[in-house]
Amino acid sequence: MIGITPKGKQEEVMALPAKGHIVVLGTAGSGKTTIALLRAHHLANIPNGGRVLLVTFNGALVKYMRGISDSNSYKLVVENYHKFARGYLNCRGKMPRWNGILSPDEKTYYVGQALEAIKAQHPTESTFRRSKEFFVDEITFIQRFGFAGFGEYYEAERIGRAAANIKRENRKWIYAVYEKYNELREAAGRKYDWDDLAFYVFNELQDDDTDRLYTHIIVDEGQDFSPMMIRSLVDAVAEGGSFTFFGDVAQQIYGGRLSWRDSGIKADRIWRFNVNYRNPATITAFAKDITESDYWEQDSDMIEATTQIAEGPKPILVKFSNKKC
């Protein structure tokens, strides 16, 4: 196993009980990925304990985690979310053998077809003057938050969607395009796209009364996950098991500020890693100035590094005369 000894709050998180929900928020470079991997090994080595899933969003991080781990235990599985999702739906007989998931380009095509179909029915509606890309983005927003119907979408706060200003009374037109998109997709024999896969996993888990495969699930880089991804993983944990969320919510990813509070996680407290072992103080101070600017959406969950271990030169700012340089 990697030769790193947890320190301070890291050590406290390692010692937490193997049950319930745990949330760990930290700055970049505070050791979240390392502790996620160490905790996964710890849980996998509990005598007579269950299986452990360490899940992240991208394949590159999966390869990195496997590369620095020397564990061959069948009890520890490291994979990205979409592999978990496809595997689960497949074992439930809900994943087509070929071409079951639309590619991003195919999704854009079917959204465009849906837009034209609804627009033809309401040619004077100004909402349909927006671009096809706008509708793709808004439908993705609907999918990632897993709204159960139009009512939930109508009432939803525009988290991370300030740039896509939509009056509530006009949301019905977007939802009509969304429903038409689903209709066209299903008619073509394509049940899922990459953005609503988690929605179907969650719904399938609601109807699944068989024993859960994993006793413990650990999410690393949780800020990369949509709310529906998190909700599905929370529901995939066996009764009496644990769910651990490691996230850097100081990052703005997907245009949506993922809050663990909106994702089905029930934690009594938040553990915070605020010691930066990677970036020098000069870089951290520069990043802090950016987060305090008008260009950055403020968030109460953001963790500010209080200590920097590394030292280094000040960052160099380069200004160009135009965007083409």
What positions do the PLM features span?
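Conserved P-loop NTPase-based nucleic-acid remodeling module centered on helicase motor cores
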Residues: 64-139, 143
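Conserved helicase motor core of SF1/SF2 NTP-dependent helicases
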Residues: 3-12, 22-100, 167-170, 176, ...
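Intrinsically disordered or highly flexible coil/loop and linker segments, enriched in small
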Residues: 120, 124, 145-149, 187-191, ...
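Class I S-adenosyl-L-methionine-dependent methyltransferase module
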Residues: 130, 134-165
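Structural motif
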Residues: 125-135, 168-170, 188-193
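Short coil/turn segments at secondary-structure boundaries
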Residues: 27-28, 151-156, 190-199
